[in-house]
């Protein structure tokens, strides 16, 4: 299971535009093979920082989405709203012995 976290700092006056892009894309992302969950989180302060959190069956499923036509359409629109490059992490549960 891959837990994908993406941090996006959006232009303050474009937050509503970004939220609309996410809402229009959410169900299409969930329909992708291997996607179990996707949600948008907003920082309390400063409130122009957002995080997307998604769960993927495998890294291959995530990468297939990132290579998809849909991602190729949505990402440029999102990228145009950023104040700086997005940061992203693909993580998985660490089965450390102390857990």
Model-identified regions with their sequence ranges:
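Glycine-rich beta-strand-turn "strand-cap" elements at beta-sheet edges
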Residues: 2, 39-46, 76-99
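Short, well-ordered beta-strand segments in beta-rich or mixed alpha/beta enzyme
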Residues: 2-9, 39-66
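N-terminal first-folded block
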Residues: 2-36
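Non-catalytic surface loops within mature trypsin-like serine protease
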Residues: 10-12, 58, 92-95
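Residues at the start of alpha-helices and the adjacent loop-to-helix junctions
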Residues: 17, 44-46, 70
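An amphipathic, aromatic/His-enriched active-site/gating alpha helix that lines ligand/cofactor pockets
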Residues: 24-36, 55-89
